[in-house]
Regions:
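Polybasic, glycine- and aromatic-enriched phosphate-binding surface used to engage nucleic acids
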Residues: 1-214
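Non-catalytic DNA-recognition/assembly elements of restriction-modification systems
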Residues: 51, 207-251
Length: 251
C-alpha cells in the first residue's frame, strides 16, 4: 500500500484464517495465514484497493511461467487474463492452442453475476464471520472447540457457530459433559468423529441468563477450565455418580 489511508482501507479485506489443525480447546494457534475476503454483498470496487488488485492479477503471469507457458506470458498475457476473467466457463485458447497449467486445461470461471475478484457464489451469512464465534475441526479423533472474536475465517476443514451466549456454548462443548453429549456422533471408517453442524445442533443445552453467560465468558478469558466444567455439571443437575462416570470416560 502506498499510503496509510489505503492500508487502513485494505485491511478490511485481509482476514486471518484458521485451519482445522490450528483449533485448540477454547482458542487456537494462528499460523500467520491470511485470506483476501471479497464478499459480493460488500460491493467492493477493486480499483480502490490497488495493492490487492495487483496481487491477484500477478498470479496469472506467475502460473503461466511456472507451467512453461512463457510465450503466453511474454506475448499474450492481456488476452489470457481477459479470457480467464470472462466468466464464460470456456477453455482458454491462445492462437488456437489450449492452455494447460500442469495437466489441467485452463478455463474461465463459471458464469456468475459476481465480479472477477469476488467469491464465485454469494454468501448470505458473511457478516457472521466478524462476530464472536466457536470454530472446530470437522473431522478428528479429539474434540476441540476454539473461541474467536477477531473476525478470523475458517477453512472448509472447520465448522463455526455464532449467536447468543456463544461463550457458554463453547464451555459446554469443551467440557466432559459436552464430550459425553457428542459421543454418538457419526464416525469415519478409521474411527474419527464427524462433528458437523448437524451433529452439534441436536444436543440438549440448558438455557441460561445473560449474567450466567458473562460468568462463563470470565472463566473463558481466565482459562479456568475446572470452574467451567463444574458450572456445566451444575446446570445439568447430575448426581455425583454421574459426574464421576463422565469425568472418567469423556475428558
Amino acid at each position: 500500500c502506498e499510503t496509510e489511508e489505503e492500508r487502513a482501507r485494505t485491511s478490511e479485506l485481509i482476514r486471518p484464517i484458521l485451519r482445522g489443525r490450528d483449533i485448540k480447546r477454547y482458542g487456537y494457534e494462528w499460523a500467520n495465514l491470511y485470506l483476501i475476503a471479497t464478499f459480493p454483498a460488500c460491493r467492493y470496487d477493486i480499483d480502490n484497493y490497488p495493492a490487492v488488485k495487483d496481487y491477484l492479477v500477478s498470479f496469472a503471469e506467475q502460473n503461466l511461467r511456472e507451467s512453461g507457458n512463457n510465450w503466453v506470458a511474454d506475448l499474450y498475457l492481456e488476452d489470457y487474463c481477459k479470457q480467464k476473467l470472462a466468466q464464460t466457463g470456456k477453455f482458454i485458447e491462445i492462437k488456437g492452442k489450449r492452455i494447460y497449467i500442469g495437466n489441467t486445461a485452463e478455463k474461465a470461471r463459471k458464469k456468475t453475476s459476481n465480479k472477477w475478484f469476488e467469491t464465485q457464489d454469494s454468501i448470505s451469512y458473511w457478516e457472521d464471520f466478524s462476530k464472536p464465534k466457536i470454530l472446530w475441526k470437522r473431522v478428528g479423533s479429539i474434540l476441540r472447540f476454539g473461541y474467536n472474536k477477531n473476525g478470523a475465517l475458517g477453512l472448509d476443514s472447520t465448522c463455526f457457530a455464532t449467536g447468543n451466549n456463544i461463550e457458554y456454548l463453547c464451555g459446554v462443548l469443551n467440557s466432559p459433559m459436552g464430550h459425553y453429549l457428542l459421543k454418538d456422533s457419526p464416525k469415519t471408517g478409521t474411527g474419527d468423529l464427524l462433528i458437523s453442524v448437524q451433529a452439534v445442533e441436536p444436543i440438549k443445552v440448558p438455557q441460561i441468563s445473560q449474567a450466567e453467560n458473562d460468568t462463563f465468558k470470565y472463566y473463558l478469558d481466565t482459562n479456568d477450565e475446572e470452574e467451567i466444567n463444574r458450572k456445566v455439571f451444575e446446570l445439568y443437575d447430575l448426581s455425583n455418580d454421574e459426574k464421576t462416570y463422565i469425568n472418567e470416560n469423556f475428558r
